[in-house]
């Protein structure tokens, strides 16, 4: 585990002491949880499908100090400090959709391991952009989990198990639907392939790979529309996919035989409509593209990876339909995709990123074009919209300083 650099530690210490008073000679716990980028597998995780994701060089960084209270106090740079009491760890309806719900939910999960919850103060900074599809909420959940695991003396928690705790917290306490990919990527670190068919024990593989070594930069571009505002559009994707699965007596599309789907298509279309059927078509097509892209990356075949990524982007736009939230004159994601394609001029690849309906697009940009690409996208969409990211090999962890 790596300690924070001097600048990060100084920032965290200043924030902590401004909010909670001097640390003195008390023991300090450092916590780190990265953001993530979905590399392959657009809306496949919630159907038990396959995903490739990478943790990024942006993160939640925090320090925690135990107290003799029954309160957890949290200082998040740039936001009001808040606290929860540990009198009850049950879901609080008044906290849904708030940061406090994530603390209480993770406390419930860690306490369920058989440890006694104890108070602590936690100050953190977050360089993961919120509402941009880089999973800032998953990083925060994982950071709370690693802090509680260590401070409360819980048994060591495997990355996938911590991810499942974080997912339950987001689903039940924060009250937002999500698959497991975001949390798993944050907890695993590096570039990882995930198979979610077995929800209890997802299969994972990791690969050491740096896109820059193959001549490309991973660039994410904020489109100027927060995907948080499109929660209903997002929620409709798994709902419609699972409506299709339900017609076969199944819960998720991974449990449905594609040949059975083909045979029943006219009936499904008449009952569920075109979009639900199109989204199911995307699931199977994209799932296959994930496996092909993982094989290409393992073989070091970046050209084939890019061809398949372009196919994936087309499927998301045409069949999954998570690029445009509501038809009308404002289409920020489609606009950003068009501009990116214009600059790339047939090179690299670009696709919608993550949940879609706003947030970010993802581009793999030739290194000789990356400065021009970022400058042009920033000129069109606003300074800071486009950023070059690197894959980080560290998943969520905590370490005593």
Model-derived regions, located:
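Structural signature of FAD isoalloxazine-binding scaffolds in flavoprotein oxidoreductases
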Residues: 50-69, 188
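Short, conserved glycine- and acidic-residue-centered signature motifs
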Residues: 55, 99, 329
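Glycine-rich phosphate-binding loop
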Residues: 357
